Each structure stands twice: as structure tokens, then as C-alpha cells.
């Protein structure tokens, strides 16, 4: 009974499957704080819940970059006292100072998704080093793409030296023309299990989400991963303390615990997203490193952000034309 009296609960709100059980158990053993884990399916559901409770009910939330920006704007997030997170300096600066939290006042990154090109050198003689190579006529009817139109339009913009987030409609139209010229090379556009087309040898090259890249490499270690020379596009998940968190102390304790290098390594191996903790990299197993550790020489990254409605509508129109051309 005595030990039960010492157990304090704290409320974590995020997607399902974001932490290995050994981390949750280890934290409770070390601190006496038990985690009540609540899940949401979509970022928008999380924001609605935070709005409803005016930033109360939960001690720590982990969500996607774009929705965190909105939560901060609505006053639902409290500023962090980073002096209370002794492991804070372990974080990788590549994933900090981003659009949703430019001064790093509110959030701690917890994993990044970076879509990449993966190809089968046994099926093509094209030495792929960037997005531009996907246009090579030698890859006719031999490429699979994921179905996120802002990202696919975005990599086309990158081949033109432009930003994913340009609002220049003439530039976006020019990218649309160029994207149409990629259609002959596209075998499939699909968001679900896109890696299967590459694993089976149905296509020679694919543009895949992080989790799909990991799956493909686990099955086919002979596949080549490309960090495109034109620059990476990525999304970041991050933790924050809601404005009226009932147990902010517990949130700080957990953020500190999961960013200790060995603990962070276990977390990133488990979730399969890119490691946002520099000090954890040496503890990540060699076979996982090529899947979740960003190479030192990787090109600069850029996050897809909210843009004007006019630009957004033009992207959607371009995407529909492209999909029709691929059918």
C-alpha cells in the first residue's frame, strides 16, 4: 500500500504506439510517476480537445508541426523552462528553430519524417542522386510515388531551385508543367504500402515515406536510399506542455527521461522515425542507423507549411491534371 501512495499519474496525449513499454515502465520505476496514455487518430482531434479544455486535462502532448503552430497561436501551449530538461542539449539543431516554434520556446522535437527516393540498382542503370533523376526517360513506367500532392509538387519545385512553400503562382504553374512531363515514368501513385511495388520488383524506383523506407530496407537491404541533392522535405513531431497542464512537473520529468541518449535510442528504434536527438545516435544499432539517422552530408531540409488558399488551390488543380495524365 505504501508504494502505491507514492505513484502519481500524469496524462500523455499522442498517437498510439509512440513509446516502447520498457520506456514507460522505466520512467515509472525511476520517478514514481505512472503514465495515463490517451490516443488521438488525427492532429485536428487533438486540437479540438485542447480547445475544449482550454489547454487543460493533459500534461504533455506530442503532435505534428503544423497543428502545434495553431495551438501556440491560440494560446494553448505554455513556454518551456528548458533548464528543467537536463537532456535538452542532446537535441539535434537541424530539427530545431522551425516555422512552428522559431525561437524554440515551446517544443521539444520527437522524431522526423523524411520522404526519400529508394531504388533497385539491379533494375536500372540510372544512378539516382536527386529528384531530377526521376524524369530520366530510362525510368519510363518504372516509378512509384506516394500521394501527397504538396510534397510531389514540392519536389518538382525543388528541381527548379524553388521552395516547397512558394506562393508565386507563375512559379507553381511552371512546376505543374514540369510535373506533367514526369507522367510517362509513373507506374503507380499510392499512399498505402507504396514500398511493396519496389520490394516485388514491379518498379525500379519509388518516392516513399520514412516508415515505408524502413520497411523496404528491412526486406531488401540491397536497395539504395537517396538523400536528394536538391534538398530534403520533412515533417517533425514534437512534444509540448499545454497551457493549463495539471502536472507540468511530470511533463518535464518525462521529457528529460526520453531525451537521455540510451532512452532516446530505444524510442527512435521503436517508432522508426528519424532520430532528433544527436546524443542518441551512437546508441542506435548499426542496421537501424541507415534508416533513422540523418547522414552528416544530407542536404538542408525544408518543411511543407500552410500557404495562401490561392496557391493551395492551384497545387490541387495541378495534382488532378497530373494524376489524370498518369492513368
Set out the residue ranges of the language-model regions.
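Ligand-binding pocket segment of bilobal, Venus flytrap-like solute-binding proteins
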Residues: 144-148, 156, 164-228
Amino acid at each position: 500500500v505504501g508504494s502505491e501512495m507514492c505513484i502519481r499519474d500524469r496524462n500523455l496525449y499522442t498517437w498510439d504506439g509512440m513509446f516502447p513499454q520498457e520506456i514507460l515502465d522505466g520512467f515509472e520505476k525511476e520517478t514514481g510517476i505512472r503514465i495515463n496514455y490517451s490516443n488521438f487518430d488525427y492532429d485536428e482531434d487533438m486540437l479540438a480537445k485542447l480547445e475544449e479544455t482550454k489547454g487543460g486535462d493533459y500534461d504533455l502532448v506530442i503532435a505534428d508541426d503544423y497543428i502545434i503552430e495553431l495551438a501556440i497561436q491560440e494560446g494553448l501551449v505554455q513556454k518551456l523552462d528548458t533548464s528543467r530538461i537536463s537532456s535538452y542539449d542532446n537535441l539535434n539543431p537541424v530539427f530545431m528553430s522551425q516555422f512552428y516554434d522559431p525561437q524554440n520556446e515551446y517544443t521539444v522535437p520527437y522524431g522526423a519524417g523524411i520522404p526519400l527516393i529508394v531504388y533497385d540498382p539491379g533494375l536500372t542503370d540510372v544512378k539516382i542522386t536527386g529528384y531530377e533523376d526521376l524524369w530520366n526517360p530510362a525510368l519510363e513506367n518504372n516509378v512509384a510515388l506516394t500521394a501527397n500532392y504538396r510534397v510531389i509538387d514540392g519536389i518538382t519545385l525543388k528541381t527548379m531551385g524553388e521552395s516547397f512553400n512558394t506562393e508565386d503562382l507563375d512559379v507553381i504553374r511552371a512546376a505543374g508543367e514540369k510535373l506533367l512531363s514526369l507522367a510517362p515514368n509513373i507506374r503507380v501513385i499510392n499512399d498505402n504500402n507504396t514500398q511493396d511495388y519496389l520490394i516485388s520488383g514491379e518498379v525500379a524506383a519509388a518516392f516513399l515515406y520514412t516508415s515505408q523506407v524502413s520497411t523496404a530496407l528491412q526486406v531488401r537491404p540491397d536497395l539504395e536510399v537517396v538523400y536528394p541533392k536538391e534538398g530534403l522535405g520533412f515533417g517533425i513531431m514534437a512534444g509540448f506542455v499545454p497551457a493549463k497542464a495539471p502536472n507540468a512537473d511530470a511533463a518535464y520529468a518525462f521529457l528529460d527521461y526520453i531525451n537521455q541518449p540510451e532512452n532516446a535510442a530505444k524510442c527512435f528504434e521503436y517508432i522508426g522515425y528519424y532520430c532528433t536527438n544527436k546524443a542518441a545516435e551512437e546508441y542506435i544499432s548499426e542496421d537501424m542507423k541507415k534508416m533513422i539517422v540523418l547522414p552528416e552530408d544530407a542536404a538542408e531540409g525544408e518543411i511543407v507549411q500552410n500557404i495562401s488558399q490561392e496557391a493551395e488551390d492551384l497545387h490541387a488543380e495541378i495534382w488532378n491534371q497530373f494524376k489524370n495524365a498518369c492513368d
